[in-house]
């Protein structure tokens, strides 16, 4: 009896936690300075099949800004830039030491509470030196929601933890 109860309990507990993965695309070239400012672009909205998730690009940029603001002297989102070229033009007018380009690779919002199919995200994050435009770090962060949910979960809920963990490695 205890063996069966243990198996059931482990299945339930494992379904109660979101899972995350980080796939670094390059080694971090140098640690970032916390005395420097960061400029973040706003990625295009996530799309799954024929569904465009409105505001997912804006939400992603804000979550990236939040993660960097814990370490940088300032972190700013620019809503009308989606790539490095645009950020570099904006950089000329400001004093940003680092340029961050997020890109939504996968964004899937599911009704997990009744379907059992988890929400999923995958976001590529590239960090550039604002002066030289050389890439100093790049990763792909992914997340999958917990199986046991009572509703109200969304893909953006999967962003803070992996973003925070990766950004921390850029500074520490």
Language-model features: where?
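Short, highly charged low-complexity linear segments
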Residues: 67, 96-106, 158-171
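Short secondary-structure boundary motifs at beta->alpha junctions and helix caps
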Residues: 122, 128-172
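A structural "domain/chain start" motif
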Residues: 15-71, 168-172
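Second-shell loop/turn segments in exported
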Residues: 47-55, 112-113, 148-153
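Short beta-strand->alpha-helix linker/helix-N-cap micro-motif
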Residues: 65-89
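Surface-exposed short loop/turn segments
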Residues: 82-136, 146
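Structured loop/turn residues at beta-strand edges in well-structured enzyme cores
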Residues: 11, 33, 94-97
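Sec-dependent bacterial lipoprotein signal peptides
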Residues: 1-16
């Amino acid at each position: 009896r205890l063996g069966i109860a243990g198996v059931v309990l482990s299945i339930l507990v494992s379904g109660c936690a979101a899972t995350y993965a980080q796939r670094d695309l390059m080694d971090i070239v140098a640690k970032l300075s916390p005395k420097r400012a960061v400029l973040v672009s706003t990625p295009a909205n996530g799309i799954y099949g024929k569904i465009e998730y409105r505001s997912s690009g804006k939400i992603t940029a804000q979550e990236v800004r939040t993660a960097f603001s814990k370490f940088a002297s300032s972190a700013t989102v620019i809503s009308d830039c989606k790539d490095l070229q645009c950020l570099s033009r904006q950089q000329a007018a400001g004093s940003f030491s680092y340029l961050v380009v997020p890109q939504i690779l996968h964004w899937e919002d599911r009704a997990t509470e009744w379907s059992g199919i988890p929400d999923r995200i995958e976001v590529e994050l590239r960090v550039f030196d604002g002066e030289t435009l050389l890439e100093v770090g790049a990763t792909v962060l992914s997340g999958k929601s917990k199986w046991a949910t009572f509703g109200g979960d969304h893909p953006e809920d999967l962003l803070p933890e992996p973003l925070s963990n990766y950004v921390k490695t850029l500074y520490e």
